[in-house]
């Protein structure tokens, strides 16, 4: 569906995207994760034709983006984090206005409007002023506006910001249902439970590159991604602080947490402890969470882009 190969984008001397390669399958909900400055906004802006890129190749539906930008944009929709409608207008007036902006008319308008309203359960509030809607209802109106062109690909940017847990779950269920309507969803969020609940696959970005991608289960259940807990006997050594780095967390004086289980890292840590005369009580494996994996993969190389 969406194939990105060797994508590069710089702002002056700062590289926002660095030879980024990614494939997003059709009819899936794909999570895009990354710390601030990882390049997510730049990537989403490129995919929506809002900014150009320096080099590389992007295709939608096997069509090159640069040569087919207008046709591709008609099949995509970006639903922003900020509320993009007029609060002084009713729900119906907002939907009609934005349909007019997109020049959607006739039977197409009727069908698309019906789909947008029904999937977001707005039928009972069509004549209500948008300013009087609850936080969750405003979010649903925001989504409905983004569905007026009946897109094949929907980009969601933090769609549940600032709403209560019940409304959040309601919106997530709505988004999950779009997959069964043969739509592809690209979903960005900093809230890991959301990603785990609705996404089929995830890509983790850092410093303009994809550092990990695949299904969440394959990521967290990968043998080398497992956490290793090293429990120590009480000791008076001050050496532990020198061992702290991205892969090794000093929980306390008697506990180390290794955020990956490679035999090389384990052997290195055990050798260092032995050299310092620190005795090991036990070593055990713990389950890795998406959040701990994310922190481990993105703890270095952050930029300001």
Residue ranges and their predicted role:
Residues 56-67, 71-72:
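Conserved ABC transporter NBD signature motif
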Residues 96, 100, 107-125:
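Conserved ABC ATPase "signature" region
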Residues 129-133:
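Conserved ABC ATPase signature
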Residues 154-158:
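Catalytic Walker B motif of ABC-type/P-loop ATPase nucleotide-binding domains
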Residues 226-297, 305:
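Short, charged/small-residue-rich alpha-helical element at the C-terminal edge
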């Amino acid at each position: 569906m969406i194939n990105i190969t060797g994508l590069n984008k710089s702002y002056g001397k700062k590289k926002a995207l660095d030879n980024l390669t990614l494939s997003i399958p059709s009819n899936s909900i794909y999570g895009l994760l990354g710390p601030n400055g990882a390049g997510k906004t730049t990537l989403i802006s490129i995919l929506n034709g809002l900014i150009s890129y320096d080099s590389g190749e992007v295709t939608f539906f096997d069509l090159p983006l640069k040569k087919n930008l207008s046709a591709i944009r008609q099949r995509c929709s970006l639903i922003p984090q900020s509320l993009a409608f007029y609060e002084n207008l009713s729900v119906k007036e907002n939907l009609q206005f934005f349909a007019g902006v997109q020049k959607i008319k006739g039977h197409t308008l009727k069908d698309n409007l019906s789909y947008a309203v029904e999937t977001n359960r707005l039928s009972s509030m069509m004549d209500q002023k948008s300013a009087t809607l609850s936080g969750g209802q405003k979010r649903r109106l925001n989504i409905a506006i983004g569905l007026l062109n009946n897109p094949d690909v929907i980009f969601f940017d933090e769609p549940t910001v600032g709403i209560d847990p019940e409304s959040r779950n309601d919106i997530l269920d709505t988004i999950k249902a779009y997959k069964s309507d043969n739509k592809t969803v690209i979903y960005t969020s900093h809230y890991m439970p959301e990603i785990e609940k609705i996404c089929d696959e995830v890509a983790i970005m850092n410093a303009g590159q994809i550092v990990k991608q695949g299904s969440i289960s394959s990521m967290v259940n990968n043998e080398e991604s497992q956490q290793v807990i090293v429990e120590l006997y009480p000791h008076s050594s001050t050496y532990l602080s020198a061992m702290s780095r991205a892969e090794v967390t000093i929980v306390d004086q008697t506990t180390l947490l290794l955020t990956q289980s490679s035999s090389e890292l384990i052997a290195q840590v055990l050798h260092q402890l032995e050299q310092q005369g620190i005795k090991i009580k036990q070593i055990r494996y713990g389950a890795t969470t998406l959040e701990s994996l994310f922190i481990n993969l993105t703890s270095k190389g952050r930029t300001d882009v």
